[in-house]
Amino acid sequence: MKEPAHFVRRGLFNVLNGNISYDGSNVPVYNAVPNNATYPYIIIYSVSTNQIEDNISNYIADVSTRIEVVTRFADGDGGQLQANQIINSISQLVILKSGLMNLNSDGFNVYSQVNEGITYLTEDAPDHTYYRGIISLSVKLEQI
């Protein structure tokens, strides 16, 4: 079986990049956050790949991927709302019943993209407060 995690990340990147905005500005999407990143931003990373069914003809896997929104405010400024609204925009593009990612050219047929939960975290640093929204996404696919 081919390892599909990087194909899933690239597919999600292609779906989100240039398609998520906040207050009229594009929200950048990364798989590795550069030192000069501006806030808010989105990062996509793989968690695991598990073979979920073994039959005589196809490899079927569940790829667990996280899509994380990171926002930052000076202490006492801002809140979770920005992360909530960006997560809402992302959810409408990736948590679908039809129109799933097309990874056919990579040798995979995606048949399910399921929200496994959305987590919100707050981190207080000395000079800023960071709000993070994290979508845990299960992508089920078969190698074709």
Pin down the residues of each PLM region.
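Charged, amphipathic alpha-helical segments and their flanking helix caps
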Residues: 1-27, 47-144
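Short acidic low-complexity segments
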Residues: 29-38
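A short, hydrophobic beta-strand-centered structural micro-motif
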Residues: 38-48
